[in-house]
Amino acid sequence: MYMKYRKWHLLLVVCGAWLLLAACSMEVNDKVVDSHPSKSDDRLLVLCEGLWGMDNSCIAYLDQGQLIDKWFQKQNPKQHLGDTGNDIIQVNDTLIAISVNWSNIVQYIYPDGRAVAATENIPNNRRLASDGDYLYCTSYADGGYVAKVDVRTKQVVDTCHVGHEPEGIAYYRGRLFVANSGGYAAQEGHAYESTVSVLDAQTMRELKRIDTGCINLFGQMSQCGQFLCINSAGDYYEVAPRTVVLNMESEEFRVFDFPATYNCTFGNRFYVIGSSYSYNTGVYQYTTHTIDLPSLQAHDGLMEYAAAQPVIESMQSPYGIYISPYSGHLYVSDARGYATNGYVYDFDGQGVQQGKYYIKGLNPAHFLALP
């Protein structure tokens, strides 16, 4: 089954990469913007996905406004991160996990960037969650499953099959909540998924599936206490994207008529940048929203970060959003042409721009602030 996935998707990746390179301006004579130190004390890791199939994922490090590019390679001169970094999380005080999708590994590092070990038997690995003792990783392989990894040994100790092409995963009070996408529907001959699988984390058995009625639960998923913010990407033709906010305590949910492609949480709110794409028009449309918790009241824009709105609207391709839990600073990345180096913007708690950083990496997408 795995060989079938790898051969098919290798063909898709090669074709897609050539199309992307042909369609996007490479902007060889790129103008480098000076990176001025921020007023924030944040120590921030920025995971750049790179281009699928190009083996060029990397991590940039922002240390109180000072940018260190290719940080992982500098800390590990004999290693490179791999192909398509897809997620990064803090497992515990001494361990960080990075899902490197097309390299089929989960890379572990210390907070200082030194590589520790890797789990290398979770093919097509996607998103990560942890309870401190175990790491949970979604995988598109073998019909879609979740792997449970002992963080002491870095070995897979159990698995559980879920829906097709599972994406986001969250741990809450002994249970795992997994957003199933069915994203390979057109290629694999199955329908898009609209369910969230609920697993017992101890036994790794699926307890139920919550049908949200919204297809293709693909993209970033944020957790704020008992609430999850899940993006429904639609089918890119007739079915519009949506946002699903799930209460993991009651297993009730509410659907909003805007996408949450890139989302994060701070305080009692979700902050959302939605990206809507239509094959009918070939056009991306971007929106911003804020969702209050627990009232689930939605607002246009990014509330107290409203001053950042004009800058975000000027970005070519917003590709990630994150608010530091330590400083309250808002970080937004711009992937630009997807085949060129990107930018990361830093805004303070009032949305005033504090810095703009030229990242020597493609598609900066995932953030982690270190304590």
Model-predicted regions and their roles:
Residues 25-371:
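Predominantly soluble domains enriched in secretory-pathway, periplasmic, or organellar proteins
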